Regions:
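Nucleic-acid endonuclease domains
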Residues: 1-80, 87-156
Length: 156
């Protein structure tokens, strides 16, 4: 089962603020995104990412990590005894794409959220074993990739 969430204007303002701070700090520190796609804007990627995190936190009534300091990956959430890494794309039919480097600091679950401001849909999740046995290339270098139809449904 999929779940759709529409962010309100305060949540969108929070997302824009955190995305701006994360993008600026990364630029100052000289760090880059794990997946570089020609022509993509780092701020837009950060904005979609934090929106996905807000959607997940709002859905599960858990605290959102509001930090904007430089992070080297790792999970976005802990839900029960499972670590969760949220991946967000604006493509409605998008796939769960996980950079190769995530294998060094794996999360227990990888969640795919699709959408664009203000409405997003939680599509499902894959386990770390499923993710790390799904190496492929979506046209921008090697990564782990799982199609939506192969994701597990959440119970809401």
């Amino acid at each position: 089962m999929q779940h759709t969430v529409t962010l309100d204007e305060n949540e969108i303002m929070l997302a824009r603020t955190i995305a701006s701070l994360r993008t600026g700090n990364n630029r100052v520190a000289g760090t880059s995104h794990n997946v570089q796609i020609p022509g993509q804007d780092n701020f837009r990627n950060d904005l979609l990412g934090i929106c996905g995190e807000i959607v997940f936190a709002k859905t599960y009534n858990i605290y959102l990590d509001l930090c904007f300091h430089i992070r080297s990956g790792g999970p976005d959430f802990k839900l029960g005894n499972k670590t969760i890494d949220v991946k967000t794309t604006h493509h409605a039919n998008g796939r769960l794409i996980v950079p190769l480097a995530k294998k060094n600091k794996p999360s227990d679950r990888y969640v795919l959220i699709t959408g664009d401001l203000p409405t997003f849909t939680i599509r499902g999740f894959a386990t770390s074993d499923e993710v790390f046995s799904s190496q492929g290339d979506v046209g921008h270098g090697s990564c782990f990739v799982i199609n939506q139809e192969n994701l597990h449904a959440f119970k809401f």
